[in-house]
């Protein structure tokens, strides 16, 4: 989020009520001066509202989720982050999408000792902000 804000983007974090804490963690990792440019909308929007907001975004960065597929349907530039789920089975159906995935193969459900205590698969942890920024830049070129 910090790198995107430094490039002039404002950040909207979407999700359900169960994602509020994760959204706040993301927001709180930002320097205080940048926090006003990151709004945690998790649990605060209806699906219709989220779709409307996503449709107006300059670029979307999303994990493999329902909102990622909505973003793909809006034909907005999209960076789709895949961990243990497979884009072979659930790809974003858009020619304006870049898929980032650090592992090969199909659906991987096995938890590994290198996964975080919060349950984040190591393959998602391995996706760096630099990887995401490179994809965003290529979509904006």
Task: Name what the model sees in each region.
Residues 94-141:
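Leloir-type glycosyltransferase catalytic cores
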Residues 1-83:
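Donor-binding and catalytic core of enzymes assembling or modifying cell-surface/extracellular glycoconjugates
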Residues 74-102:
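Gly/Pro- and small hydrophobic-enriched strand-loop and loop-to-helix capping segments
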Residues 37, 43, 86-89, 96, ...:
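Glycine-rich, flexible loop/turn motifs
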Residues 33-38, 86, 100-105:
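Short, structured secondary-structure boundary patches
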Residues 35, 72, 91-93, 126:
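Non-catalytic, surface-exposed connector residues within folded enzymatic/regulatory domains
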């Amino acid at each position: 989020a910090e790198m995107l804000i430094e490039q002039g983007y404002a950040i909207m974090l979407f999700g359900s009520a169960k994602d509020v804490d994760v959204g706040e963690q993301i927001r709180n990792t930002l320097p205080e001066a940048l926090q006003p440019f990151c709004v945690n909308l998790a649990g605060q929007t209806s699906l219709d509202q989220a779709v409307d907001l996503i449709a107006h975004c300059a670029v979307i960065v999303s994990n493999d989720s329902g909102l990622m597929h909505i973003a793909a349907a809006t034909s907005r530039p999209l960076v789709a982050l895949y961990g243990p789920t497979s884009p072979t089975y659930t790809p974003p159906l858009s020619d304006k999408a870049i898929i980032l995935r650090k592992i090969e193969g199909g659906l991987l459900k096995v938890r590994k000792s290198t996964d975080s205590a919060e349950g984040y698969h190591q393959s998602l942890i391995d996706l760096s902000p630099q990887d995401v920024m490179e994809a965003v830049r290529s979509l904006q070129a």
